[in-house]
Amino acid sequence: MITAQDIKAAAKRMGADIVGIGSIDRWSTAPIQMDPKQIMPNAKSVIALGFRVLRGSLRGIEEGTYFSNYSAMGYGGITYLYMPMTVINLSKMIEDAGYEAVPMGHQSDWRAIDGVGYLRENYSRPVAPGKAAPDVMISMRIAGFLCGLGEIGYSKMLLTPEFGPRLRVGIIITELELEPDPIMEPGTLCNRCMACVRECPGGCIPADRTVKANVGGYDLEWADVDMNRCDWVFQGGAEVAEGEKGDYFDGKSEAWAGKYKPSDINPFYKAPRNLYNTGKAICGAKGCTRACMISLEKRGLLTNKFERPFRTSKPWKVDWESEAIEVDYTASYEGMDSPNTKKSKSETD
């Protein structure tokens, strides 16, 4: 018989950083479109696997010089390459023992609800009374909470004692009954410092508007995050003034064409292409992840510690109203021998 300890040890060998287990009864208050039993009626346990987003993958955005790394290596690469392999291989181990396992490495683009939480109009229909409309979507953050990985912070992000908000979560729904982990008491990490509110570049996290929900017997409350606004702020867009035309998303989104320009936390004239399907985080999760992480590290609450603080200088901003900074140096090694290359004093002596 496979035990919870066997599962956790195997998951970490396969690449997970943290692992938690929740009994299926903890989802008794889940909306039907987010209920694991809609996928596996005989489910007994949910296993949540946490994969750290490297602090270094945020460094380039913090410095304003290397934006693709977070979307590629810290977000998309984990979500679409690294995490699925671990989730699939752990599911194989469970099924080899005779218990069915549903691997879920990320949210499906086929889900019936949109990014805000409403059913998509004329998208899919239940196949029988009492069943959810396909596809069901399990909230990975809620799963992390119910499996004991961490708590839901004011920003709606899952916060863990190891990495704070720097985490991606995959889950396995299984009919294997496992010993569950205790749920973290809300307020253990998040003290409502509102750093996420202050630093969100689009004001998407309101200080005075919240959502309340009973999750696993706990009364939780988090910000009523404006997910529609976050969608274009996250990608580096800013609304244009009345009568002004913006072309930042032109050629990328017909619905957004002409409506947005680059924001002051974005150095790109036009929206770069996606990396790994959804990777386009120009804002670098400035409020919900970076500001929160900085706050938690300053308070000494995270076990993943570093020799130096993350932020060592004043955050930069792009002034799009001013003249562009002139680039008067060689852009590549190939140009270093050109006649226009500036030479050092030692080379000209």
For each predicted feature, which ranges?
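Extended, amphipathic alpha-helical scaffolds
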Residues: 333-349
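Residue-level signal for secondary-structure boundary sites
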Residues: 55-57, 180, 300
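Non-catalytic, usually N-terminal nucleic-acid engagement modules in DNA/RNA processing proteins
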Residues: 1-88
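Short alpha-helix boundary/capping motifs
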Residues: 39-40, 122-123, 316-321
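Catalytic cores of enzyme domains
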Residues: 30, 72, 76-294, 309-312
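Short conserved micro-motifs at the rims of enzyme active sites and ligand-binding pockets
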Residues: 58-60, 237-246, 302-305, 348-349
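C-terminal/domain-terminus segments
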Residues: 298-328
